[in-house]
Amino acid sequence: MRHIWALPSLTALSLFQASAASAVPRARQAINTSSPLAPFRTKRRFRTQAQLLSNSATKTTLVEEMVTVDTTSRLAALRSLMKERNLHVYVVPSEDSHASEYIADCDARRTFISGFSGSAGTAIVTLDKAALATDGRYFNQASKQLDSNWYLLKTGMQDVPTWQEWATQEAEGGKLIGVDPQLISSAIAEKLDEDIKNAGGGGLVGIKENLVDLVWGSEQPPRPSNSVFLLGQQYAGKDTAAKLADLRKELDKKKAAGFVLSMLDEIAWLFNLRGSDIAYNPVFFSYAIVTQASATLYIDEAKLTDECKTYLERNKVTIKPYGALFEDSEELARRAEADSKDAKPRKYLISSKGSWALKLALGGNKFVDEVRSPVGDAKAVKNDVELNGMRNCHIRDGAALTEFFAWLEDQLVNQKAQLDEVDAADKLEQIRSKHKDFVGLSFDTISSTGANAAVIHYKPEKGACKIIDPNAIYLCDSGAQYLDGTTDTTRTLHFGTPTAKEKKAYTLVLKGNIALDSVVFPKGTSGFAIDVMARQFLWKYGLDYRHGTGHGVGSFLNVHEGPIGIGTRKQYIDVALAAGNVLSIEPGYYEDEAFGIRIENLAIVKEVKTEHSFGDKPYLGFEHVTMVPYARNLIDETLLTPDEKDWLNRANKKILEKTLGYFENDPLTKAWLLRETQPF
């Protein structure tokens, strides 16, 4: 069929998958089956005080948060296209062609077809069913946003199948499953194809035309094409020539022909460029190919300033059109095929997250190896300039958050103001924007009161959010992009008198945060191995939280950065933490329809001195850089040990030393800061 990629036969690759039974939950009842698609509306997105991002497009949203969208007509149109292509199942991933977690509106296909707007999840549509699989961060949100056309697959729960298992079951009897090959990794695609055939299905086919795009039609937002700017050496700390030299050493070690980059943050980091094509993430649509002899950046050249072009030329980087990547990849495959007649060819490397389409264009398994990206590994270990930038921007950001919390308490308690969750988020952004090197937010602020705080990735929308209740928990998870670093901080507060239950929950979460922050571990330890430190106090009471404990953070890059993290994902088992990593430490506790608690700091991994050095290994620990006090009225001191009180006193002393000077002419904030940092 002309719609199907002509694919060579592939050898299936192994892929870790959690085992699960094949039970499928019943479709839940719709909250509002007649809700129409919310109209496109302007949202907060990257802003700049200088002219760095002056050409940034306005971010639009596809659905109002927590509103159910009627997907009946969309599903009918999609199924009609599926029948034309002899497909029984069609998979709609969350990601774009660069495996981005956060995506541009034009790539929000899963949101469009399902109505679910969380950042993680996969939609699977058959000719008579539809399922949405997502993880524990989004169970609450998905249950509110999905209409009655959809099953909710709660990934990781007992007796709930993975989306792959559900799709495979639906393909039994020789049926075909289709997917856009640019939106799925080759590892997942090849394993899924093998599983489908083993279960009696017809297999997985790559459909070149994205069927959701065809349903979306003229209403699909245009692809952003914003300007790109050069990040100076005073912020990057290392020039592109040096980074390319390091990458080429890795290619030589692996005896590779080259590395084809598809991850947007890796490309931005490698070439010391930043953009704004994806809201809150200073990246731009691009690809790159690096060999021992050349480096090519695939990008719309009109996006580059003269300064960027001069810099790239000086670093011997060739510029080619964004759309030429696949054609050039196919040419590389043809050359490799010709060369292989005389000698064993050197393979090209792609990221293990690279798309199925990219691997096929490069010639498949014969000419491609999928690896954990050497650029991603290098990016995750910050240099001294980047680390100092992270320290400095967190002082400024801490001052902004302190000013905001003091203002908010005064407004709610003393002024009796009626402020909704968006009012608060906007005020925080306004305060942040006054600080040096502020560029914009690093993600949409989670400003949540009461029961909304239990929605882990809640996003307030004007006209559909709550008035902040001073007598309920208030959770604020927010971050900013500065030229010298990226921030991500969560604080949970109560502006009235918290209940004993709320205080106990908060204190257990705080104890977990302190324990993980204080841990010392040998080099080679993974984030998986230390995750228990944050959960242990909740576990003693039979409590837990359904999200990871920590994620990597970029340096004026994506707020979620791999490959490192702290949690139970397989990659967190495989990837050891290293000095120079920057991660979040963010345990939490949530009661649906009641309240939510999360306490998040960012921390630098660094070498620490120990009395001994077993196995001649260096030992590592954390230096937390977040400079925001904890909520004193939510702390049950009777649950704290003397060591934990000492930790809090040291932390508060440092916060006071670093931020008090910002408030010499601000008596309200100064008084709030002094009160919240009093010794225990």
Curated annotation (Swiss-Prot):
Residues that coordinate or bind Mn(2+) 2: D477, D488, E600
Binding site for Mn(2+) 1: D488, E586, E600
Keywords, comma-separated and alphabetical: Aminopeptidase, Hydrolase, Manganese, Metal-binding, Metalloprotease, Protease
Record InterPro entries: Creatin/AminoP/Spt16_N, Creatinase/aminopeptidase-like, Creatinase_N, Pept_M24, Pept_M24B, Peptidase_M24_C, Peptidase_M24B_aminopep-P_CS, X-Pro_aminopeptidase_P
Gene Ontology biological-process annotations: proteolysis
EC numbers, comma separated: 3.4.11.9
GO cellular component: cytoplasm
GO molecular function: metal ion binding; metalloaminopeptidase activity
Annotated family: Belongs to the peptidase M24B family.
PANTHER family to which the protein is assigned, alphabetical: XAA-PRO AMINOPEPTIDASE 1 (PTHR43763:SF6)
Entry protein name: Probable Xaa-Pro aminopeptidase P
Organism: Podospora anserina (strain S / ATCC MYA-4624 / DSM 980 / FGSC 10383) (Pleurage anserina)
